[in-house]
Each structure stands twice: as C-alpha cells, then as structure tokens.
C-alpha cells in the first residue's frame, strides 16, 4: 500500500486491515527467528533512522518545535503571506512526522512481541493525533475565504506548488457549512463509526459458530478464519456443512445486522444531505473527484457482459459434475494437484523477466529494490503476517512479505513492487503536497504488474496443466476483483437509494436484494440457497461507504495499460507513475491512455475473461475432464 498523508492515515488503517484480513496475525509456530535470516533478506530500516535516539529526536522536534508554531497562524490565513508560510510549515512538519510514524510501525511489524518497539509505535500514534489537531484549523479557514481570493492565489506564482491543493479546496466550498454547522458535523463524527464498531464486535467477538465434522469425520470448531479454507476442500458435503454452519449462525443475528447496516446507510445519507450532495454515492465519489458516470458505467458494463460469468459457472458445473452450482461450490479449485514451487531467488528472476516490457529504467529501480534491502522477505517469529508496501516521502519504499515459494507469493511480490515503484517515481517527481497517490490510481500500478506477470508466465508455460493453472488463477482474479466487487457495488447503490427514497431496510429486504443479484450474476446453472442470501451480513466493506468499486476500475484500467505496454508504449505509463496527486485521478488515467468514464475498459476486460474461460474449457475437453 502507498504511504498516505495525514488525513488518509485512518482510512489506510481500515482499508489495510481488510486487504490482508485473511493472513493477518502472528507468525506460525516453528518459523525462524529474525536473527537467523541473512541481512540481504531483511529490510534496512536504518536507512530511515540509524538509532532509536535519532528517531526520538525527530519525535520531539515535531512535538516541541513544530506543533507550537501553528498557534501563530490560527485566524490569520486571510493574509496571503501567512497562508503560504503556514502551508510550507505544515509540509515541513508532515515530512518528519511521516518518517517518525512509518518507522515506528514498520519496526513494530518486525516483532509484534517487542514491548519496547510497541511503545514507540504508541508514541508515534499520539504524536500524529497532536499533529492532526495542530493543523485542523487550516482547511476550515481556507473554506471561509471568498472564492475570488482562492482563485487569485491559484494564479499567484508563489502558490504554484499548491495550485492543485487549492483547487480541491475550492471544489469543496459549495459543500461546506457555516462554522456552527461544521462544528455540529464534527461532533457527529464521534459516533459515526458506531455501526462498523457494532458490526465488528458482533462478528468477531460475540458471534459463535458450531462444531462440524470435517472431510475425515473428525469434529472441528468452525471459525470465520478457517471458513475460506474449508470452501476449497474437495469434499462437497464438508463444504456444505461449513457453509450451513457459518450462515446459520448469521441467521440468528440477521435482524441485528440489518439494523446495523441500515444505521450505516442512514449515516452516509445524513452526511451527504448535510453537505448538499444529491446522494450518498455522489458525496463518496467527490472525495476523490470521481464523476458519477464512472460508477454507473461500471455497473452497466458488467451487466452487459454478465454472460461470461454465466459461462464460467456453467464450466464449474461440468468440471465438478453437478446438477446445480451452489455458493459453496464457487471456491473449490477447478485445477487440482498442480503446485509451482518457486524460491525467492527464482521469483526475482521471473519478475525481472516478466516486467521487462516496462523498460530499462523501471528494471533499474527493480534491481535497486532487490539489492538495497527494500524488502523484508520471509516469515519470522512474531512478525506481522500480512503483505504491504509503505514508506515516507523522504525514504525509499519498503515492502513487507512473508514469502512462501508459491505462485501467489510471486504475484504478491510483483503487486507490492508495483506500489513501491509508483511511490518511488512519484516522490522523485512531485513536491510533498502532490505526492499522495489516490487509491483509485494506486491499485492500477500494482495490478498492472500482476497482469504482466501472468501474461509472461502463460507464454512460457510448458504443459497444459501449468497453463490451466495460470488461466484459472487469472480467471478467479478477474471474477473476484470485477464481478464480485461490482455485485457488492450494485448492492450498496440499491440500499442507499432505497433509504434516500424513505424506504426501510429489513433483513428480509436485504436478503431479497442479495438473492436477486445472485440470480442475475451467476445465471441458470446456479442455485440460490436461502442461507446464501444472508451474504450481505458478513461483508465488512459495506461499512466503508462505496469503496469496493475501485478494485474493479483498477483492474479494468490496468488491463488497458498492459495492452498499451505490450504494444511498446511505456512512456505514458511511466509518466502516470510519476503523477501522484498533481491532477485528479480520472485525468491522470486519461493521460495514460485510459478513459474510465466510458464502458470500454470494462467491456474489454470482461471480453478477455470470456476468452480465458473458453481456453480453459478447450484444455479441459482435451484432457477428458468434461
């Protein structure tokens, strides 16, 4: 993930927790101690601070030197010179605060059992809260300035670095309330997270699941964490028992979860109305200045190409020899018993070969990342077990991995390197104020690498089994990233629109909406079980206010980028990687040759999905498996 600026850090924490939700925790038993891993496979955080004392010096500098200075600017930002001084001081402070915060968190992730480092992390979080409070007056004061004044600053050469920032402020002006109104909305934020908090407490703390018999007849405890693994089991009866065990538990609390989700939707509608937006969807999209047409066209394009998903479900039915496909049949691998054991050194070579189309300069940065200890490679005792990319403006990027010799690990590494090199190029090109990469474009950089890698591996596949494995990997990736996420997006849109019309959302209503979507998306070969219509009750993303559509747009955009790169047009893409937030996300993508306001990118990706399914079917027929 990309390093975020101040106002993005909380969002980053929430989103990051969902992205790595299936693998987060402490390291498993029997893994090596950190001291047993050669230095070349460990990231070098000393590139940020060579000692805890130097980290502490910067922490104190932020707290005791920078923060007190902002009192001198409060109430004085109508003075052009004072405003410029204040913005520059904020950037100066934030560059140091970012380093302090990022270092402490990454250091803690090396060993989550180290109490001394956990203290550092806690101190950095307290510091960031104080930083946030110290600069919180800036935007409200700017928003109270006359539009004419803000526009004049945008034309002033001394504000050249802040032109984009001021333009974004100006766009928010029609949606800004009086000081009293803003104060009320700020007070409301204290309980705005309550629906999500109740959902997580209920789902992860209070909800209990039954014991079931596994595929060998042993009694096991069913948990949320183990459920995904059980759905991949070859034993259909076991999969069904796991499915029914999970969803029968959610069925007991469906009315509570319906009330919780309704509260979340009503909250979004309330804030949208308060800020004079036409809808909750419009208010959410406005945070990254995304036109409504992008969301609507995404749903339209997926609906127009839903036949390809129906074809894939039909293929599943044939391969698994079923009368009807149920939801617990959608995750068992179609390609069994094919494993690719790829050690880390091999992975590096594969990535350097697979990403060759990106050009010599990109490969040069890749080699720097591999050779200069940007990457923490292997699982160790008490190490954070997710995977991410992070860093600050004044550091090189860092990547945390738990590499395990699988194809999934290779693709994860390529993905995180995409984020890292995006960050590297942006920070080398943009001023701090424009160095944040919005999520809408950040995931394009990482997904582009994944698609390039799979294309490369498909070209060098030595057998039908290897090719089938890779095809299935890509098909499942597109299904999960596009079809499933757009199904979620369509559900979110409908439930918000119903509340905006004054309709109530009961558990029955929500299940009916979900059931109808399942019928539409999965087609005639699919059987919608009554318990499966409770799927909405488990999804944390529905408490993230129209977030999931970005997964789908990112993959569609990345597919267009890859086609251009494979034609030899890398220059536009490298410029895209340098853009940061120097322009709005839609414009940045247009400069890279991708227009996400049209349906074309999604149409192209899903047509490709259909072709991949056709090729899978052809190989399976050749092998006599269908």
Where are these regions (language model features)?
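Bacterial N-terminal signal peptides that target proteins for export
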Residues: 2-13
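Hydrophobic core
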Residues: 14, 18-22
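His/Asp/Glu-rich acidic catalytic environments and adjacent acidic regulatory segments
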Residues: 28-75, 99, 105-293, 301, ...
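C-terminal, non-catalytic "cap/extension" segments appended to globular domains
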Residues: 35-37, 45-46, 50-52, 142, ...
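Active-site-proximal, well-structured secondary-structure segments within enzyme catalytic domains
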Residues: 157-163, 211-226, 255, 259-402, ...
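Active-site recognition of the HExxH zinc-binding catalytic motif
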Residues: 276, 404-424, 446, 451, ...
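Conserved helix-loop functional segments at active or binding sites
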Residues: 353-364, 390, 419, 423-431, ...
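Post-HExxH zinc-binding segment in Zn-dependent metallohydrolases
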Residues: 437-466, 474-480, 554
